[in-house]
Amino acid sequence: MALLAFGGKRDARAHARDGSRADDPGESDEAHERDEPSADDADEGEDDSASSDEDETPLLEGPDGGRRKPRGGCPSTMVRAGNFCIDRYEAPNRRGGRPFVMQSANDANEWCQDHHKRLCTEDEWIAACQGEERRTYPYGNEHVDGRCNDDKTWEKVDEALLAKWPSLEAKEHAKELYQATPSGSKRECTSEAGARDMTGNVEEWVVRTRDHANAFPYILIGCYWSGCYGGNKPTCHSTNNAHGPEFRFYETGFRCCRDAAGKK
């Protein structure tokens, strides 16, 4: 599985593809000590977080010297929404990291399982995005320009070149198109639960749990840095059901979920 992320700024170039249609109209900011994946790492198809336990539920030392899990039933790198935990950031789930792209649903499933989590369901993702207030956007019911990374310039992509993935040429083209912002840098693009960048930035794979025009087991949700097809702004219900689990594109990423420990 070749994971693609970038460690530096890229040219502001991207495009929206026809499949990106919208079918349905308490935080800790400590920086992770490890470096984010670099462009060189991406070229080699390496994921320098795959062997890390940073996404495991850490055991904290209590006042009696015993070990306990963090409050809320979720790891410190996740936030709680109802009876489940969801990654605070898009994979690789690091504040200030560059979100993975060119990910298929199969890739996403494998990565989440390797980190002792699972791919979020559609219902979970929407619940974490809209919150108990059932917001249209993670931050409220009215779109605010610049609040999330959803207004980058549209530019045509060479799909035939990307189809050669994981060739060096395909990776270089994906880099040219990459306009995701570092995870968490849009501080106001935060849901009620505390999840960042849920609309815009990279489009995220989830397990389909609702009826759609196509019956693929996975869908993409939240649109990406150039918004949604037709100029629509990404909402907590913006979905793309047009692709099977092997599909990958220059803006496709994901985040992971897991069951929460104990009652909220």
What would you call each of these model-derived segments?
Residues 107-109, 114, 118-237, 250:
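Functional-site microenvironments in short loops/helix caps that host divalent-cation chemistry
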